[in-house]
Curated annotation (Swiss-Prot):
This is Membrane protein insertase YidC. Required for the insertion and/or proper folding and/or complex formation of integral membrane proteins into the membrane. Involved in integration of membrane proteins that insert both dependently and independently of the Sec translocase complex, as well as at least some lipoproteins. Aids folding of multispanning membrane proteins. Pfam families: 60KD_IMP, YidC_periplas. The keyword Zinc does not apply. The chain crosses the membrane at residues 350-370, 424-444, 461-481, 498-518. Belongs to the OXA1/ALB3/YidC family. Type 1 subfamily.
Amino acid sequence: MDFKRLTAFFAIALVIMIGWEKMFPTPKPVPAPQQAAQQQAVTASAEAALAPATPITVTTDTVQAVIDEKSGDLRRLTLLKYKATGDENKPFILFGDGKEYTYVAQSELLDAQGNNILKGIGFSAPKKQYSLEGDKVEVRLSAPETRGLKIDKVYTFTKGSYLVNVRFDIANGSGQTANLSADYRIVRDHSEPEGQGYFTHSYVGPVVYTPEGNFQKVSFSDLDDDAKSGKSEAEYIRKTPTGWLGMIEHHFMSTWILQPKGRQSVCAAGECNIDIKRRNDKLYSTSVSVPLAAIQNGAKAEASINLYAGPQTTSVIANIADNLQLAKDYGKVHWFASPLFWLLNQLHNIIGNWGWAIIVLTIIVKAVLYPLTNASYRSMAKMRAAAPKLQAIKEKYGDDRMAQQQAMMQLYTDEKINPLGGCLPMLLQIPVFIGLYWALFASVELRQAPWLGWITDLSRADPYYILPIIMAATMFAQTYLNPPPTDPMQAKMMKIMPLVFSVMFFFFPAGLVLYWVVNNLLTIAQQWHINRSIEKQRAQGEVVS
């Protein structure tokens, strides 16, 4: 396998890693036709306006939350243990409703006609500042009696957790049975989070999981296309007995959990209605309407649901709800990237440093693939040793391409060289490269994780470009060990490609570049050893197999 094919292999792998989602976007989900009636009922609910908020601040060891006292919306959520992408001196803000972007969590109670019974009513709280005391802190917002119903909205925050419980306490004094449903939604705009780039772009938008439809992304662009086609509101609607839904972005997520692991679904009184749409105000909403059991006059009831708003930490989210780890965006290679990250995580648990864990993982992957890559590199080494003879054939036959090809094929037969012998093993490595790319790129566990010296965050680009420069040097070394091309254009490509790849990797997370550098160093050692072995055999007059 010559350098041209090797370069093509890396180029194809890189294009697939970066552009797979763009080349093969997730198919747009189609609403079930029998749910048209439910669609009208769900969309009839008034969309809560994002009016100026009267803030209630809640501080725990993991988050600082701002709740609007009037609407009861969760308007701002700061993750105190994570630094902002653009400014490491500030904490990371997940929810917000400022000038920069809109991203909030809302909840309402709806009547049988889908009307928000709390619209225009307003809550009140006994104080404006709450902090963690013990393991939990509870914020109770009380609304004036409406329709004979006394309603409180209660937020419960837990120490060491990114789970927020949202509960409605309802007392029915209306003189009649109350038939209600609780509507929970996450609303955001289309703004890109900080850190998004062409080489480091990840999915941002709605996601949903149900047993019937499995995991699906419902992209902003799909919702926009529906809106442009003439619909007043583009929607994705489904009925489900369980599941979860919300919004994801690189490393972080916010999801309503319909059935916590090992517990009863909130949809026990009837199937929940999921609704994902672009609203009339051009904000995007993922919501679920949860039917409540009929509340008799004089009775009390509650509607409770968990909101997970935090990092996509695999070990955490896997224990919150079934298949919640699917929200960790490994693109279309989840089946392969997930076990690779599992192995990387096990190594980290032993070593204690993500950078060294990446190095050990690279060595393990290289060892597993050794039987395949060894055949490829032996083929390249034999081609390298036969390069003078190939050059002589080219000079002898000049422009007679037919005679030149026949002479080369005879040389391959005499030297026991299969010019394509190394292609298949190299192609089989493509899934490994792609899987590792996504495993490293998508994992919040590597965010702000140091390696050594100047590498203080493996999820961000090398600030001094040292690793990309080392990578370029290793690629130049590989070109020296590869068969020298007889074509002048290929020779130029050999000199240019290391520089091109190095510049591209300036923008890649340091963890990815570290993997590539170590892999290149191991490849150089393997190729050098094989070259020496074949040259020694040729010098001794042995037949090289």
